[in-house]
Design a protein with these regions (language model features):
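Subset of Sec-pathway N-terminal targeting signals
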Residues: 3-46
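A structural-propensity feature for long, helix-poor, extended segments
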Residues: 116-152, 290, 393-398, 412-415, ...
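Flexible, glycine-rich loop/tail regions that form catalytic "lids" or insertion modules at the edges
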Residues: 78-88, 95-130, 134, 206, ...
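Extended, charge-enriched "interface" segments that sit outside catalytic cores
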Residues: 31, 49-229, 246
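Glycine- and acidic
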Residues: 5-10, 23-24, 213-225, 247-251, ...
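Glycine-rich ThDP/TPP pyrophosphate-binding loop and its adjacent helix/strand module
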Residues: 229, 233, 247, 314-518, ...
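Cofactor-binding active-site loop characterized by glycine-rich and histidine/acidic residues
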Residues: 247-412, 416, 624-679
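Active-site pocket-lining segments that scaffold enzyme catalytic pockets across diverse folds
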Residues: 207, 211-271, 577-583, 592-606, ...
Length: 704
């Protein structure tokens, strides 16, 4: 039957479906056959007029109420609009129906728009065929009912993994996620090899924790028990990153699970970890009073697919989240050093706690840097070990938001919420997150909801403040036990094989402990390696004085370059006079002022091909109008940086970066400190806008 062009007043009443109509129009224009025939008839020659005023909706709410209120033209496919409205509801709100808590103590809040009846769909409608072309989970040759569609939407968006993406305004980015979530319906690829690899990593994590728990009773280690799915998450992240072209990963994390990450991801020798627990010679390393769960480490690994990656875990203090900007600064410096212009080869990974991610201001400062030209790194992967408690503080007392991750919505990035008791979904979330980061060069967040089996540390008694939670935790099987039971039930592995793997890994740790104690293993901290290998280190007194003078001719050459403007550049009249004054200073006619002296100092380094990077609030002009490192054409606003043009060929001088930073002290100083760690052969400067503003970055100064 041929239909007349649609009455688009129907569309005006559908709110969220305006986006759907726009997508339909685009698909129909590209290929009319790609759209359901009934909907294609609506689009044929249709033009959207101005807004229409729908009738008052009946009670009940949701898009279904709007549908009921309309006088729908004969033949308009109401089911298609209702089905699409239900699909959009799951895409927007499905995460609210996910059972995220592995303990089952908190139920999902749900959302009324996830109910078919709130979209005008009756129980009889659910037995009718679902219109085609509405979502990405359709399979060739099948004809599911609307009830089937609802079930599959629940599996895709409301099972053990939920995705927040409604806050992302770019439809291409939402579509990227929908195309990957809907066909698989929230299931990791049914691959026995991958499942056994997940199990093996869980066993490694569990065996190490239990070994330390029995051999070093009461010693603080901030165990990962309750959140051990972090280990397969990171293991597969390395695999996915290698396949995506990443060559180096810089990680930052706090104390929770750090020893497990060091041993089972970075490959730190267990006997070295045991030596740190035994602490036979506390004065064997320079520096004192640091602890084993602050230590950093670097190593080269090869993924199972054969890709070589360099992994670095940054040293960190007990001050939560202080390491975040330091890691991102290191990533940016490595990208510069490796010529990673596309920001695809070096990846930053930050592992947070739920209370700290919501509570620490440095998190927001670091997130805000992610899109800024002077600080962007192509996207950081944020992983929250969400054990639903901050030391002794409940979430209701530590944040004002539903999720601990809500601060990240300001970046319009996807946020994956996953139940840590389901490691296959944890790995699937990691795969999606990595793919999204590489495709769109933005941050991505994984909120892994888990629990903490012991107190904040192993000598703490959590039952004082969370008695009901810890009664439940005492009865809760471990993640390894749950997953191995699941694989046994699916005939993927036999119980005897699991027991054999556990026994073998325990025996290996026993041998490592025997060797550590028989040989008197001492803790080792390696520094002055990599880009620092050519530096001697030590105290200031042990470093010989060197001549830092610069020939007069070199300074005059720099002065001429920085006071010469390109043709057709029109400076502000006051800037023109300033350049004339600086030219006179360069000739020696008048004494240098601070601004000119600084330019000559930077220029002398740049002439020797040394990188110079300066950032701070209003640093390009200078707070007191003293610097003017960036000049702007008065006619068209085009910027010109004299210090970047000392030579006709930019390869014949050092790179000069002068950056107006975000209005942040701690975050920006942390970033620049991190940058300097991987650029010892460059001059990296953070400038406090006023001298006393430096105390806004006090944690960075004190701890790093």
């Amino acid at each position: 039957m041929s239909l007349e062009p649609a009455d688009w007043s129907l569309v005006a009443a559908l709110g969220a479906n305006l986006r759907y109509i726009e997508e339909l129009e685009a698909r129909y224009a590209a290929d009319p056959k790609s759209v359901d025939p009934a909907l294609a008839a609506l689009l044929r020659g249709a033009v959207l007029p101005g807004p229409a005023t729908p009738a008052a909706p009946k009670s009940g709410g949701g898009a279904g109420a709007a549908l009921e209120s309309l006088s729908v033209p004969a033949g308009v496919p109401e089911l298609a609009f209702a089905a699409r409205s239900l699909i959009e509801a799951y895409r927007c709100h499905g995460h609210l129906a996910v059972q995220l808590d592995p303990l089952g103590l908190s139920a999902p809040i749900g959302h009324p728009d996830l109910l078919p009846e709130n979209h005008g769909l009756s129980s009889q409608d659910l037995d009718r065929p679902a219109p085609g072309g509405l979502w990405f989970g359709a399979r060739a040759g099948e004809q599911p009912t609307l009830g089937d569609l609802h079930t599959r939407l629940q599996r895709a968006y409301s099972q053990h993994l939920g995705v927040e993406m409604a806050h992302i305004t770019d439809p291409a980015r939402r579509r990227f996620l929908q195309e990957r979530l809907e066909p698989l319906e929230n299931r990791f690829v049914d691959d026995r090899t991958a499942q056994l690899r997940i199990l093996d990593r869980l066993i490694e994590a569990e065996v190490l924790e239990q070994f330390l728990h029995t051999k070093y009773v009461g010693a603080k280690r901030f165990s990962l028990e309750g959140g051990k799915a972090l280990i397969p998450l990171l293991d597969f992240l390395v695999e996915f990153a290698g396949e995506a072209g990443v060559e180096e990963i810089v990680l930052g994390m706090a104390h929770r699970g750090r020893l497990n990450v060091l041993a089972n991801l970075l490959g730190k020798s267990p006997r070295q970890i045991f030596a740190e627990f035994d602490d036979l010679d506390p004065l064997s390393v320079m520096g004192s009073s640091d602890v084993k769960y602050h230590m950093g480490y670097s190593t080269d690994v090869r993924s199972q697919s054969g890709h070589k990656l360099h992994l670095s875990l940054a040293f960190n203090p007990s001050h939560l989240e202080a390491v975040d900007p330091v890691v991102i600064g290191r990533v940016r410096a490595k990208q510069r050093r490796h010529g990673d212009v596309g920001r695809q080869r070096v990846l930053g990974v930050l592992i947070h706690g739920d209370a700290a991610f919501a509570g620490q201001g440095l998190v927001a400062e670091t997130l805000n840097l992610s899109g800024l030209e002077g600080y962007r790194t192509g996207g950081t992967l944020h992983i929250i070990i969400n054990n639903q408690i901050g030391f002794t503080t409940n979430p209701t007392d530590s944040r004002s938001t539903h999720y601990c991750t809500d601060i990240a919505k300001m970046l319009e990035v996807p946020i994956f919420h996953v139940n840590g008791a389901y490691p296959e979904q944890v790995v699937y979330a990691t795969q999606l997150a990595m793919a999204y980061r590489q495709a769109f060069h933005t941050d991505v967040v994984i909120d892994m909801v888990c629990f903490r089996r012991y107190g904040h540390n192993e000598s703490d008694e959590p039952g004082f403040t969370q008695p009901l939670m810890y009664q439940k935790i005492e009865r809760q099987p471990s993640e390894r036990q749950l997953y191995s039971s699941s694989l046994v039930a699916r005939s993927v592995v036999a119980e005897s094989d699991v027991a054999e793997i556990i026994a073998r890994k325990n025996a290996a740790l026993e041998e490592e402990l025997r060797l550590a104690r028989n040989k008197g293993e001492r803790p080792r901290v390696e520094w002055m390696t990599g880009v620092w290998a050519g530096y001697c280190g030590g105290t200031d007194a042990s470093v010989p004085d060197v001549d830092t003078s610069v020939p007069k001719e070199r300074l005059q050459e720099v002065a001429r370059s920085i006071t010469t403007l390109p043709p057709h550049f029109t400076p502000h009249p006051k800037i023109e006079r300033l350049l004339q004054q600086r030219a006179a200073m360069g000739r020696g006619d008048v004494a240098l002022d601070w601004g000119m002296g600084e330019h000559l100092a930077f220029g002398s380094l740049l002439a020797d091909k040394v990188l110079v990077r300066v950032s701070g609030q209003d640093s390009r002009r200078g707070t007191f109008s003293q610097r003017h490192a960036v000049l702007y054409d008065r006619q068209n606003g085009t910027p010109y940086i004299p210090l970047a043009h000392l030579r006709d060929d930019p390869k014949q001088q050092g790179v000069f970066h002068i950056i107006d930073s975000a209005l942040s002290e701690a975050g920006v100083l942390g970033f620049e400190y991190g940058y300097s760690l991987d650029y010892p052969d460059g001059l990296v400067i953070w400038e406090a806008q006023f001298g006393d503003f430096v105390n806004g970055a006090q944690v960075i100064l004190d701890q790093f």
